[in-house]
Every structure is written in C-alpha cells, then in structure tokens.
Amino acid sequence: MHTKTLTELKAGLAAGDFSSRELTEHFLARIKQYDGELNSFVTVTEEQALAQADAADATLATNRASSSVSGLLTGLPIAHKDIFCTEGVRTSCGSKMLDNFIAPYTATVVEKMAAEGAVMLGKTNMDEFAMGSSNETSYYGPVKNPWDLERVPGGSSGGAAACLGARLAPAATGTDTGGSIRQPAALNNITGLKPTYGRVSRWGMIAFASSLDQAGPMAQSAEDCALMLQAMAGHDHRDSTSLNEKVGDYLGALKDDIRGLTIGIPEEFFPDTLDGAIADNSRDAIRELEKLGAKVVSVSLPSIKLSVPAYYVIAPAEASANLSRFDGVRFGHRCDDPQDLEDLYKRSRSEGFGDEVKRRILVGAYALSAGYYDAYYRRAQQVRSLIRDDFARAFEKVDVLMGPTAPETAFKLGAKKDDPVSMYMADVFTIGVNLAGLPALSMPTGFINGLPTGTQIIGNYFREGQILNVAHKYQQATDWHKQAPAFGGAQ
C-alpha cells in the first residue's frame, strides 16, 4: 500500500479495497520498523490514529451505503510537521525549549484536514524553530536522507520530506519560510508546494518570521498536493495575515491545457557556478513541457541576487521578536533554581535554544537596534520591494517561472554545520519567492549519482492551480516522481 499515491489510496478506500485501519496500521508498522534509523518522527500518535481510522471506516461504510460523498481526506493517514499545535499532543518545534509543551488547541491547518477526515500518524522532526536547511539543528537529532543515510534530507521540513521519501507516510504538512518545503522536497524526490502568502492559515503554527512563513502540502505527486491544498486553503478570521480570497478548484485545474502557456527562464537561476548536471535536469524538464505545447522565453530578475542577504536580515529580525515569548515564565523550558528574574530569563533561554536559533536571535536584535535599523532592516525591506517588482515585471510576460529548486544535491551530514553562510546558500533559488509572497512548487526531475534533484515552478499570486497543473502534466509524461529509495523497501 505504501507504494501508492495519496490519490490512489483515496480511490482504494472509496472502493472498499482496504480499510482506513488497515492502511493506518500498515504505515504505523513501517514507522516502527524503519524510523529508528531515519529519525523523521518526533512523536507517533498511534492510539489517536487508530481511533480516527476506525471513525473514518464507519463514515466510509455509511457513505457507500447511501451513495454520499465523504470528506476530501477521509481515512487517509497524514503526518504533521511538529510546528503545528495539536491539542493534547506535544508540539516541540524541534527545540528543547518546547520539549514538554502540550498544545492546548489545534492549528487551523490540522483542524481543517481533520474536518475532511484525515488520520494523524504523528509529528515530524524539523530544524529547531524551522531555522535550518539540513534538519541538523533539531533537539531530537538529525534526520537522515532515505536515499543515502549519510546525507541530510534538507530543511526545515526535513522530517516530513524524509518520511515521505521512505514511504513511511503518503503525505505530510510542511512550512516554508525561505524554502523549507521546496528544498527538502527536491532532496528527497517528492513534490512540495508553498502557497501564496496568506492562502493557508498560520493560526496555531509556531511563528519563525511572520511575514514569510506559509504552510503547505508535501506528497508524492502534484495531484496529491492539489488534494491536500483543497482541504488546507481558505480564509481564517483568527489569522490577521489570512487573505479572504476565494479558494480555487485545485483538482479541477489539473484538467486544464498547457498548450500556449509561457514559461519564463530567469537567467539568474542558471549561473555559471551552478552544477551542470543540476542545470541539465531542470532544462530537460522545461524541454518536456515544450513538447506538451508550452512556450519558453528568457527573463531576468536582477535584484534576486540580493535575496539571501535581505532574507537573513528580515527573517532573524522577526524571529528575535517572535521568540522573545519563550522565557521560562508562562511556558517553555525553565532553568533550575533561578537566583532572580534576570537569571531565570538568561539561563532558561540559554539552555532552551540551540546555537543556530541563538545566532539568528542575536543577528535579528542587532538589525533592529538603534543606529542599525536604517542601515540593515529598512534597507533589507527596500530590497524586498525591488525583488517583488522584478517578479511583477516578469509575470507581465510569462505565466510561470522555472529553474532548479536547490543548487546542489543532498550533502553529507555535518558537512556545513560549522559554515552557516554555506548552509544559507542552500536556499538561494527559493528565498526570493518568500520575500515576494508568491506560490511555488518543487517537483522531482531526475538524479545525479543516485541522489534526487528538483525543479521549481513559480506562479503569480493565487495561481496555485496553474503551477500544480504544469507539474501534473509533467508527471503524467515522466516517472521521476515515482522513483523510491531502496531504504525500507520503499520501491
């Protein structure tokens, strides 16, 4: 059953080929057998999952008897990134700071998917507070890449991507602040979508950088991501950044024709320094879409080269404010025997946060400090406006933009741990999308020495249906997304 896509599993449940309990037990058994080596889960919610599966089976049986329509995700097992609050279940955000935090409420994303009948398998490992590109900053240890256990799965949604790559779950939720859905999707040979900023509610999602964070689906195929987004998307009055925009018919959009669609190729996404094999895989994907009737033109995003430095001012600045609430007073790790309030703050935060989180808090506080605000934070926001304008000009000429998702394949565990700048460059092609608030998807487009590569499709605001359709058409013509690693008998 684990070789089937989410969409295929949905059809099997509807037809009565197997029950949700059988399906859920199958994935729980795989997690139990293989995740000790992979470390992709922080918490497995076995009892809750089986109870939800039994309830789903009852719903499916009733609906089959009455020819009624079940929820979009009824009976389908899904893993949630451990950044989404889940009532009564630990929500750690990959940090010692929240190691014992039991959320008193459930995030909107989890709530909406549960309302559509989804079964929660558990909570996936992640870089601490979503700060990282390799899933090595987690308090619970690094996640391994199922294609090579000596390599990283990418981050920060590395646990979600790795468990999907190894077929320990058919689908998962992730979050993307600078590439945290798309980069690990590329490194694990899965499909991942970052929606338009505000398309999916952030309520109950622990904040890293509030103007950049966005939740999205991760799965084997674009069709699966469309199914998940249909359940996740929508306005939420509890989230002030949620946009009251009509939810599209994402599954219906997969039937649209792409003949005449114009694909823009930003020259900045194919620099001379890029690994030639990665460039070739993405160019091959673009050529495949040309065969299907799409047109290709060259475009330029001149300010995109400034995206990484701008991001690493804006995101840490927002993080320094968001993480100030974790002080050991109301919740979070509290040090033993504090001498006074100042000692409580200092030691609780020093003990609770890891090195990368501390680094970003310091950088962010510095950028916002008197005398440096104009030199760094204000200037970074001006660069952000330039990047947004570059994308707007490009979309006057084209429908979508395409290029490699990541500049390299999965690197060795520990290879960049002492070189933060090198680690930050892992998101060089993805960060600009977050700064502009655009939707983008990563899809599998080949291998280099047995390691997956991905190609990114960027769309205009609220054009998720279009980029999902482009990816779906490509996946109908190719089988890269069907390739699975030898690990855990995923093939």
UniProtKB/Swiss-Prot annotation:
Protein's job: Allows the formation of correctly charged Gln-tRNA(Gln) through the transamidation of misacylated Glu-tRNA(Gln) in organisms which lack glutaminyl-tRNA synthetase. The reaction takes place in the presence of glutamine and ATP through an activated gamma-phospho-Glu-tRNA(Gln).
Record-stated family: Belongs to the amidase family. GatA subfamily.
Signal sequence annotation: none
Keywords: ATP-binding, Ligase, Nucleotide-binding, Protein biosynthesis
Subunit structure: Heterotrimer of A, B and C subunits.
Chemical reaction(s) catalysed: L-glutamyl-tRNA(Gln) + L-glutamine + ATP + H2O = L-glutaminyl-tRNA(Gln) + L-glutamate + ADP + phosphate + H(+)
EC number of this enzyme: 6.3.5.7
Domain of life: Bacteria
MF annotations from Gene Ontology: ATP binding; glutaminyl-tRNA synthase (glutamine-hydrolyzing) activity
Active-site feature positions: K81 (charge relay system), S156 (charge relay system), S180 (acyl-ester intermediate)
Gene: gatA
Any one GO BP annotation for this protein: translation
Stated name of the protein: Glutamyl-tRNA(Gln) amidotransferase subunit A
Cross-referenced InterPro entries: Amidase, Amidase_CS, Amidase_dom, AS_sf, GatA
Cellular component GO terms, alphabetical: glutamyl-tRNA(Gln) amidotransferase complex
